[in-house]
UniProtKB/Swiss-Prot annotation:
Organism lineage string: Bacteria, Pseudomonadati, Pseudomonadota, Gammaproteobacteria, Enterobacterales
One term under GO cellular component: plasma membrane
Descriptive protein name: D-tagatose-1,6-bisphosphate aldolase subunit GatZ
Keywords on record: Galactitol metabolism
InterPro entries, per the entry: Aldolase_TIM, GatZ/KbaZ-like, GatZ_KbaZ_carbometab, TagBP_ald_GatZ
PANTHER family linked to this entry: D-TAGATOSE-1,6-BISPHOSPHATE ALDOLASE SUBUNIT GATZ, N-ACETYLGALACTOSAMINE PERMEASE II COMPONENT-RELATED
Domain of life: Bacteria
Function statement: Component of the tagatose-1,6-bisphosphate aldolase GatYZ that is required for full activity and stability of the Y subunit. Could have a chaperone-like function for the proper and stable folding of GatY. When expressed alone, GatZ does not show any aldolase activity. Is involved in the catabolism of galactitol.
Listed Pfam families: GatZ_KbaZ-like
Pathway membership: Carbohydrate metabolism; D-tagatose 6-phosphate degradation; D-glyceraldehyde 3-phosphate and glycerone phosphate from D-tagatose 6-phosphate: step 2/2
Length: 420
């Protein structure tokens, strides 16, 4: 990361896409996409997804590392080309507890990430805990971030410190996506970004972390990009120019969250304006969902009724029976809920892919389709971009490859924006 940031600060148009997903097919796609390049791939886990208690994936940081490395070995991607990151590391999961208890868990969280070899650490203590004022004072946020940084430094080996990098600050939306419809978005003011940097510098120095400050590579801000279930707020470069100009006088770049669904031109403009770390998550699993839905429609027409997976019906049944991952985010009317379950841009289906019933139905569908020749006309109907690549000889009409290429479509846009 440090080399990439140095190149950007030296005037090169270079950025990096941060893949924020624990889905094995998404991780496989991210690694396979860059297998034949010289680029490194940044894969990040969030604190609610992966933590010392397992998170919602059931994985600790060490488990996640091995999970990613196993996929890398299968793909033929060198492990040393993978950068592992931890996103929103702090009290996010334990906000209902008092600050002392939440921070104690957060300290252990950060230590486990660093011990497991994660080298990009987002120190985010911006969340109010039980009994805290809302919002927290910037000084409190910075002091807690310094506590977390101290924890990271305390377990890092000398070798790790050479690679270790920190990200500070936070964007406006909560981790995991917007819970309601958005009309506009608040772009971070330069004064607020400067205050974030100033308060963190002061807090780090007070804890004897002056050297660690040199490892702070980025600050998270809101550049004016966001999405909800059916709306996308697109990047307006002119609105972010004050931020772009301010960061030029520092050693850092910006990290932009929720950059999903922007245009490839927007990604290029974001990187030009020093938002050099572009995080993406739901757009990748949304592309995965689109591919699975398309293949499910193809299966409906090609496979005898008694052998079909019933994949789409199974997904719907499970999500309606177990609504905990979408209920507070989606609309309440039955028809509206179904539309959101299937097609929301926030893609909360992503939490359900590991469910045994859904996984088994998708596996059945894949086996069914691997045993037949999919007519080109059907691929043109349901996966038109993939049809074009089959025609040009870039792609085969194999279900797994079709899913991979659908995810590649998202990664292609980021590659354009981050181009070296």
């Amino acid at each position: 990361m440090k080399t990439l940031i140095a190149r950007h600060k030296a005037g090169e148009h270079i950025g990096i896409c941060s893949v924020c997903s624990a889905h094995p097919l998404v991780i496989e796609a991210a690694l396979a996409f860059d297998r034949n390049s010289t680029r490194k791939v940044l894969i990040e886990a969030t604190s609610n997804q992966v933590n010392q208690f397992g998170g919602y994936t059931g994985m600790t940081p060490a488990d996640f590392r091995e999970f990613v490395f196993t996929i890398a070995d299968k793909v033929g991607f060198a492990r040393e080309r993978i950068i592992l990151g931890g996103d929103h590391l702090g009290p996010n999961c334990w906000q209902q507890e008092n600050a002392d208890a939440a921070m104690e868990k957060s300290v252990e969280l950060v230590k486990e990430y660093v011990r497991a070899g994660f080298s990009k650490i987002h120190l985010d203590a911006s969340m109010s805990c039980a009994g805290d004022p809302i919002p927290l004072a910037p000084e409190t946020v910075a002091e807690r971030a310094a506590v977390l940084c101290f924890a990271a430094e305390s377990v890092a080996t000398d070798c790790q410190r050479e690679q270790l990098s920190y990200v500070i600050g936070t964007e406006v939306p909560v981790p995991g996506g917007e819970a309601s419809a958005i009309q506009s978005v608040h772009i971070t003011h330069v004064e607020d970004a400067a205050n974030t940097l100033r308060t963190h510098q002061k807090a780090f120095i007070a804890r004897g972390l002056t050297e660690a400050l040199t490892r702070v590579i980025a600050i998270v801000v809101q550049p004016g990009v966001e999405f909800d279930h059916s709306n996308i707020i697109h990047y307006q470069p002119q609105e972010a120019q004050p931020l772009a100009q301010w960061i030029e006088n520092t050693r850092m770049v910006y990290e932009a969250h929720s950059t999903d669904y922007q245009t490839r031109t927007a990604y290029w403009e974001l990187v030009r304006d020093h938002f050099a770390i572009l995080k993406v998550g739901p757009a990748l699993t949304f592309a995965l969902r689109e591919a699975i839905f398309a293949l499910a429609q193809i299966e409906q027409e090609l496979i005898a009724p008694e052998n079909r997976s019933g994949c789409l019906a199974v997904i719907e049944e499970v999500m309606l029976d177990e609504p905990q991952y979408w209920k507070k985010y989606y609309r309440t009317g039955f028809n509206d809920s179904l539309l959101d379950i299937r097609y929301s841009l926030s893609d909360r289906i992503r939490y359900y892919w590991p469910h045994s019933r859904i996984k088994n139905s998708v596996d059945t569908m894949m086996v069914n389709l691997e045993g037949v020749d999919i007519p080109l006309g059907m691929i043109s109907q349901y996966l038109p971009k993939q049809f074009e690549r089959i025609q040009s000889g870039e792609l085969s009409a194999i279900p797994h490859q079709l899913i991979m290429d659908k995810i590649y479509d998202v990664l292609r846009a980021y590659r354009y924006g981050c181009a070296e």
